[in-house]
Amino acid sequence: TLAAIENGYFRDEGLPEVELTATGEDHLTMDALRSGDIDFGADVKPGMIFEASSKGEQLYILGAMINGLPSTLIGTPDVKSIADLRGKKIGCKEEGGSREVPWIRMLLRKAGIDPDKEVQWVPHAGFGSLDIQKPRLDRGDYQAIGLTGHYKRPEIFDLVREAGFNVLAECTETHPYGLPSRVIATRSDILADYPEQVVKVLKGIIRGYRFARDKKNVERIRHMYLSYDWGKDGFGWGKFDATLLDGQIASAQYLPPDGGVVERGLQDIAEEYKAWGKLPKNFSYEQATRFDFVRQAAQEVDAAYGAPEGY
């Protein structure tokens, strides 16, 4: 989205000035979306939209930002497998669970561990970098944590082991088809009142994704990241060094070039939220999705700039 603004892709669609706001927390994004302070959430956890939809709120997932960003669950030396997490503490970034929590809950459940009764979740664990998490793991704040997708794989696995920890699972291996962790969402009134503008917004976003995916734009993306105020000290949840910035830029490959959501993964998320007790058993992810807009947008971008990566 930032690339779309910087490169004038929204202006190309005849849209008025588009402003990007970094709220810093998903619940703040949701509050702003509900109140009308923002019209689109470009980086929201899908489960939050599901929960709102199940309560009758007219919020919809339009497309994806991230379908399958890597996430590595690591454990202290005494935790050699997911099964060893029974009775242990697991760190997470936010109250209510950060991006990787639904995935970790799936892993626990598969190992026969109740994610609500047999482990303790410790919020505000900080950014998932090894530099930040090593001292917290060493002093026993928790025994497992998810590391950011902005490290190179498989190189990070060796770094984890050299630090004395164990690699317990990797999201891209357990869910190779993708597990959507960040989505684009809006309200029903926006869809009803401004359908053409919705497609134009999505076209701008898709072009921005494709620009970021193009490796020849690495230095321009780096400059954008370093120039923008992300609303959190240290560009993230703490120290964010050059290695992680390189990984952040490289992770653009996980932006979907058609803006679409991996529906199999989205269904996995919905099923975990049901098991979590956050959604009714009869909930269907389709009731909180409107993919027709992003499909039209992708078709128009392909027609104008070339499929599947033209921008």
How should these model regions be labeled?
Residues 18-22, 28, 120-123, 239-256, ...:
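Short linear loop/turn motifs
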Residues 4, 52, 156-159, 225, ...:
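A generic structural signal for nonpolar/aromatic side chains embedded in well-ordered alpha-helices
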Residues 1-131, 139-150, 167-171, 177-178:
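Short, glycine-/small- and polar/acidic-enriched structural segments
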Residues 192-280:
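Secondary-structure end/capping motifs
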Residues 267-311:
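Conserved C-terminal helix/tail region of periplasmic/extracytoplasmic solute-binding proteins
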Residues 129-233:
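Pocket-lining segment of extracytoplasmic ligand-binding domains
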Residues 12-14, 172-176, 251-261:
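Short, solvent-exposed loop/beta-turn-alpha elements that line the ligand-binding surface or hinge
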